[in-house]
Swiss-Prot record:
Domain of life from the UniProt record: Bacteria
Family from the record: Belongs to the UPF0227 family.
Protein's organism: Shewanella sp. (strain ANA-3)
Coiled-coil region(s): none
Name of the protein in its database record: UPF0227 protein Shewana3_2292
One Pfam family matching this protein: UPF0227
NCBIfam families the record matches: PRK04940.1
């Protein structure tokens, strides 16, 4: 089973396409949707939805996959549920990058302060990160520097921030899920 968390643009047709591509790894891909506008509510909602879906999961190793803002949540929700996660162009600091896009971006900083201390250290090797060298939204080099002590970093030379084509990375994602 794969839980897919969309980015800030929840209605993008690219989300359906990425879910379709992920079905080459596991036919059971489930969209876990959230508002993107209310971080504290989103966190509670995502925790509840993943817990509900896990009740009906026979897969011994479900995987969280998120893109952009969805990767921010995949890392945290995956950690809190003991799941591996794949972070595609993760938005590590939405309290900064979401200014002017949502009502209360400062809630992300509050969530970070209330999160388990040093959660990445406790989550070492439980996530892999795929970064685009040509991400037009986020600084991929800074993201790599922040995450490389904890997670494997895979680079893509051609995809933009929304990462429409996962095909080149599907074998690595599958191997990570099964490892």
């Amino acid at each position: 089973m794969i839980f897919y968390l969309h980015g800030f643009d929840a209605t993008s047709p690219g989300n359906h396409e990425k879910m379709r591509q992920l079905q080459f790894i596991d036919p059971d891909v489930r969209l876990i949707s959230y508002s993107t506008l209310h971080p504290k509510h989103d966190m509670q909602h995502l925790l509840k939805e993943v817990a509900k879906q896990m009740q009906y999961c026979a897969d011994p190793a479900p995987l969280m996959v998120g893109v952009g803002l969805g990767a921010y949540w995949a890392e945290r929700i995956g950690f809190l549920n003991g799941l591996k996660s794949v972070l595609i162009n993760p938005n590590l600091h939405p309290e900064e990058t979401m200014q002017g896009k949502i009502d209360r971006p400062e809630e992300y900083a509050d969530i970070a302060n209330k999160c388990v201390s040093e959660f990445r250290l406790k989550n070492t090797h439980r996530a892999m990160c795929i970064l685009s060298r040509v991400d037009e939204v986020l600084d991929s080099e800074a993201t790599a520097e922040a995450l490389k002590p904890y997670y494997t970093i895979e680079w893509d030379e051609t995809q933009a921030h929304k990462f429409p084509q996962l095909a080149a990375h599907l074998p690595k994602i599958k191997a990570f899920k099964l490892s």
